[in-house]
């Protein structure tokens, strides 16, 4: 069975209470449960990780190489300035799909740039929690499983 890692970065543990007008009322637990169910329907194992700490995200990305077939990553605010996470993504051999709940290109100007997108297989933004499912579908297509 193929295995995929879902990684959520800083403040995503606050989903459902943080800026619900931007991110919706769904919680991280709901998102992870829904994604595990979707992956199971597709015959894929999915494990989840969330951290507010850059180093923990980097370590998790490094450790995923060779264990998982790919990563779905929402780097949160690190998207816009973490060259360390960008380098971690570039250093692994498995594809990474970057996902954002909101459309980062319609928000504050500092959110318009993603330093991580250029080293990802693709980027999905603005579709709420459904964007994570789109990322899973895209990742499986990239892996030749769809």
UniProtKB/Swiss-Prot annotation:
Pathway: Metabolic intermediate biosynthesis; chorismate biosynthesis; chorismate from D-erythrose 4-phosphate and phosphoenolpyruvate: step 3/7. One of its GO terms (biological process) is chorismate biosynthetic process. Keywords: Amino-acid biosynthesis, Aromatic amino acid biosynthesis, Lyase. It catalyses: 3-dehydroquinate = 3-dehydroshikimate + H2O. It holds the Pfam family DHquinase_II. It is an enzyme of class 4 (lyase). The active site is at residues 23, 100. InterPro entries: DHquinase_II, DHquinase_II_CS, DHquinase_II_sf. Substrate binds at residues 74, 80, 87, 101-102, 111. The record marks 18 as: Transition state stabilizer. Its EC number is 4.2.1.10. One of its GO terms (molecular function) is 3-dehydroquinate dehydratase activity. Belongs to the type-II 3-dehydroquinase family. Catalyzes a trans-dehydration via an enolate intermediate. NCBIfam families: aroQ, PRK05395.1-2, PRK05395.1-3, PRK05395.1-4. PANTHER family: CATABOLIC 3-DEHYDROQUINASE. Homododecamer. This is 3-dehydroquinate dehydratase. The gene is aroQ.
């Amino acid at each position: 069975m193929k295995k995929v890692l879902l990684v959520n970065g800083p403040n995503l543990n606050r989903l459902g209470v943080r800026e619900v007008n931007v991110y919706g009322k769904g919680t991280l637990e709901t998102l992870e449960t829904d994604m595990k169910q979707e992956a199971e329907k597709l015959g894929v194992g999915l494990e989840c990780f969330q951290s507010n700490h850059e180093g923990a995200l980097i370590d998790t990305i490094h450790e995923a190489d060779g264990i998982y077939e790919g990563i779905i990553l929402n780097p949160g605010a690190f998207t816009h300035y973490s060259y360390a996470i960008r380098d971690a993504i570039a250093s692994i051999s498995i594809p990474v799909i970057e996902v954002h709940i909101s459309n980062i290109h319609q928000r504050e100007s500092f959110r318009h740039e993603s330093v991580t997108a250029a080293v990802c297989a693709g980027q999905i933004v603005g579709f709420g929690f459904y964007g994570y499912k789109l990322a899973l579908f895209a990742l499986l297509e990239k892996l030749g499983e769809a």
